Amino acid sequence: MEQLVSGAATEQMINMLKNVADAVSMEKLNDNLIRNFSMNRLLGFLTILDTEKILMHIEEAMKQYEFLTGRKLKNSTKINLFIHVGCLTERLIRNSAIEDYPEKDKFQKIHKKEIRQIQAAFSVIEKTYSVKIPISEIGYIYDI
């Protein structure tokens, strides 16, 4: 299970299921596995957000990010984003965002394109929960 979640056994899973499931079904199975694993981890952290709903919105944001950047996120990255963005959203609702980020000004100058992509992809979180993701939090999303 650990190897499936980390992505290490994804190729093995594809080989085992290739005769009974198409690529879209296997992708959906992988996404559900990652989502359920993340939900179990998030349940212990979130107190005011509906875990199922926030996961749905984060998943939407990640798909938009993959579309905008043209790159597929690894399973481990998805899990980290589910947990980080879930907790981040709750922090923002409580007005306790992390404001510090190492060399924030330098980050803003060097990574303008990436910042715009993250802002566009995660705008669903901002709109749904009426929050604004600060540049410091965007930096931490970028690091993931």
Whereabouts are the PLM-identified features?
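A cross-family "folded-core" feature that marks the main globular domain of proteins
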Residues: M1-I144
